[in-house]
Amino acid sequence: MSSEHKRSLPAVTLAAIGVVYGDIGTSPLYTLRECLSGQFGFGVEPDSVFGFLSLIFWLLVLVVSLKYLTYVMRADNAGEGGILTLMSLAGRNTSDRMTSVLVIMGLIGGSFFYGEVVITPAISVMSAMEGLEIAAPSMDSYIVPLSIVVLTLLFIIQKHGTGSVGKLFAPVMLIWFLTLGVLGARSIIANPEVLQALNPMYAVRFFIEYKAVSFFALGAVVLAITGVEALYADMGHFGKFPIRLAWFTVVLPSLVLNYFGQGALLLKNPEAIKNPFFLLAPDWALIPLMILATLATIIASQAVISGVFSLTRQAVRLGYLPPMRIVHTSDMESGQIYIPAINWMLYIAVVIVIVSFEHSSNLAAAYGIAVTGTMVITSILFCTVAVKNWLWNRYLAWVLLAGLLVIDVPMFLANVVKILSGGWLPLALGMVMFIIMTTWKSERFRLLRRLHEHGNSLDAMIASLEKSPPTRVPGTAVYFSRATRVIPFALLHNLKHNKILHERVVLLTMRTEDAPYVLNARRVTVEQLSPTFWRVIANYGWRETPDVEEVFQRCWQDGLTCQMMETSFFMSNESLIIGERPWYLRLRGKLFMMLSRNALRAADQFEIPPNRLIELGIQVEI
């Protein structure tokens, strides 16, 4: 490790604390309260307190420390993580049929994230505001309005970026975790017997004593690990080692101290179950703690919002969502983006959820099913990568998968039973996103295949045009082409109606590769097809923004000179009509047409100057 890297490690680790662990770091606000609130029939008695504390501790160890930090984070694509990245890795060395299954699983996992992201800001901020019930009971009726005000401000500032205020995230979250640890340690010192719950036998006894009821209680325990996917998804921003270092040195000790501190408080004063987190603090510290908790939940919400922006960009670039406007809010950091459509749809959904559920306890029932569903899918995809990509011993990989699913599946099933009491919300939101993603991908493929089937051979067309050239006009024309062997429809229609060609014709294909970045050496390929025709293929990673001007600069190195303001850009604009289909495919076709109408135009994606653009319409039956 270089000295430069050593100097930067503390800063990167601190930044990881501020972004990666926001969601899981605010879980102590409500987790133990929900476990012992009475909904599962558990009283605040020693056996249940010790049992839940033991379960929480060993979930943090087995799921976060072992599964994600030790195993899952090994699966990266050029340093990037996340469920869609894992899906792509898993499908690289498998059969077409198996790849289709893995893609569906990955899209379900991604859809679950969209369902979860609506709940996280709502439950986090409401839990912080509920400190008012302790500090000033008369302010109880203001919890919902204040939560909406805080989140409204958060969503408004998204368009300005979080670069400046983001520098405060890490120090605030560090103070938050230190506060968690101090509050918990004070309580543990007063009642150290609570540390017996570190023994896993208390978790085992919990299941033996409470039998079937203990299974349903897993639906509440899982609240302690919500946000665990962020560790993997944010790997590309901070790297594996800083994320692991932050967890083992700061986050895990602070969480364990706080959970066990709440447990010690409940053993001493069972009536503290109404809000054991805030009752850990002395009276004079309630208001400062509530302010700090609000800041921490805002940061946790910001991390989730940024995460959904990143996931959306990846889905758009990989062809699972229609193109949409993506604004870069920082000249220095490519990961800082803002997507207006997603931002405001998410805001409306969050406000509706807050108004409908009114209290964080009501939302807790909805929380968990998306998280645990994604955990199950992650385990399966990871073991597929281990066997197919890394050539692990098949039997050892299956043993590992069985061990992971022994934890994941019961937690998922325990949350499934909560569907009627709120679990339907993330499932419904996830289903909507899954339908949209699969519809866009499959119908777009169908459209491109139809265009390809009805297209003319490029080589034959060029040979014909060179042999019997039409009228030539000065200048360069760029035709955007999706398929490299078929003549673009815009070129075909230009010849058909205008009977002319420019002196130089460039067929430009913009491709997105299944990788976050593409090496500069592979960015642009230039091929001269004839004295007047060139084919240019530009390759970009899904984290990169296609730039036509950059493509032109690289073309110059290969002997092809193009100037943006001296070039005419031709694009085809498809007008879609639905052919004969079964009723359910007609519905899917109509959804695709609606998505296409609202998608960002290719000219806007590539920032083509409007006065240099010519669009030619074609009608296509789908």
UniProtKB/Swiss-Prot annotation:
Coiled coil: none
Subcellular location: Cell inner membrane
TM spans (from-to): 9-29, 49-69, 101-121, 137-157, 165-185, 212-232, 247-267, 279-299, 337-357, 363-383, 397-417, 419-439
GO molecular-function terms, A-Z: potassium ion transmembrane transporter activity; symporter activity
Membrane topology: Multi-pass membrane protein
Domain of life: Bacteria
Keyword Transport included in the entry's annotation: yes
Pfam family, one: K_trans
Catalytic activity: K(+)(in) + H(+)(in) = K(+)(out) + H(+)(out)
Family according to the record: Belongs to the HAK/KUP transporter (TC 2.A.72) family.
Matching PANTHER family: LOW AFFINITY POTASSIUM TRANSPORT SYSTEM PROTEIN KUP (PTHR30540:SF79), OSMOTIC STRESS POTASSIUM TRANSPORTER (PTHR30540)
Function: Responsible for the low-affinity transport of potassium into the cell. Likely operates as a K(+):H(+) symporter.
HAMAP family from the UniProt entry: Kup
Protein name: Low affinity potassium transport system protein Kup
Provenance organism: Pectobacterium carotovorum subsp. carotovorum (strain PC1)
